[in-house]
């Protein structure tokens, strides 16, 4: 990951952005356009996350990305930002996804105090579909077997399911919650074995839920960890409701704590 990319994604290097750059955020549905507006929005996220740490770098043929981790209010929150450059080498598009949903809810409250428009979850009229030109879809890479001690860092759960016997049923339930998926890009993880997949999933109500799934591999080549980030806010909220209906008898209440679930998100 270049220092310039990190600075641009933090809202600190607006000259690295194209004049017509556009940004998709984890919380809002429509894209934000224009260098000044995008740089300001990125700066608001940087401030709300309280100086997040870049923990993982991703690299693909036409897109690169960074995973950021932070603990605003003592709640570990992660976002992944993907950037594409134009022919002049300036950043043309940025897409940001977040996890986990209960802690993104708390982050949304913080952002709303600074810029209410950045926290507006409205999907508009009709099913949500991403803005922009239709991408060139690619094949989903083969996924190795899950390790016995695999951990799932879910986009919707407060806690992390661990172990093949638990993670397997969660992934099976997720597969029942969408009707189709298409792959936008596949990226390598810099410095460690694994890969990331950028996906559009067609979920209940005809909405598109956008995801980044990061698979890290252990020494045996098995999947040791899966990190899943999603956007936009309301589509993920609806997906969470579908998953709760399927898994409420499998996963205990500690997994579901958060807004509009059985228990409120605890105050740190």
Label every model-predicted segment.
Residues 1-268:
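C-terminal and inter-domain tail/linker signature
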């Amino acid at each position: 990951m270049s220092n310039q990319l990190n600075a641009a994604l933090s809202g600190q290097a607006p000259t690295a952005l194209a004049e017509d750059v556009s940004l998709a955020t984890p919380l809002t549905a429509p894209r934000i356009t224009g260098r000044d507006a995008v740089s300001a929005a990125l700066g608001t996220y940087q401030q709300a996350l309280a100086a997040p740490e870049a923990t993982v770098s991703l690299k693909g043929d036409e897109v690169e990305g960074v995973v950021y981790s932070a603990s605003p209010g003592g709640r570990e929150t992660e976002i992944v930002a993907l950037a594409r450059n134009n022919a002049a080498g300036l950043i043309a598009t940025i897409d940001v996804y977040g996890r986990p949903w209960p802690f993104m809810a708390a982050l949304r409250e913080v952002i709303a105090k600074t810029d209410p428009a950045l926290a507006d979850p409205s999907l508009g009229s009709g099913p949500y579909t991403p803005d922009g030109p239709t991408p060139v879809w690619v094949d989903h890479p083969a996924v190795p077997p899950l390790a016995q001690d695999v951990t799932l860092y879910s986009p919707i759960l407060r806690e992390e399911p661990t172990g093949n016997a638990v993670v397997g049923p969660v992934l099976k339930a997720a597969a029942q919650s969408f009707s189709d998926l298409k792959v936008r890009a596949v990226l390598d993880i810099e410095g460690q074995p694994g890969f990331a997949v950028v996906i559009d999933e067609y979920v209940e109500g005809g909405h598109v839920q956008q995801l980044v799934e990061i698979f890290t591999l252990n020494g045996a080549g098995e999947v040791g960890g899966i990190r899943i980030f999603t956007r936009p806010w309301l589509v993920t909220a609806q997906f969470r409701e579908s998953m709760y209906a399927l898994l409420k008898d499998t996963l205990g209440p500690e997994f579901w704590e958060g807004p509009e679930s059985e228990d409120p998100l605890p105050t740190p």
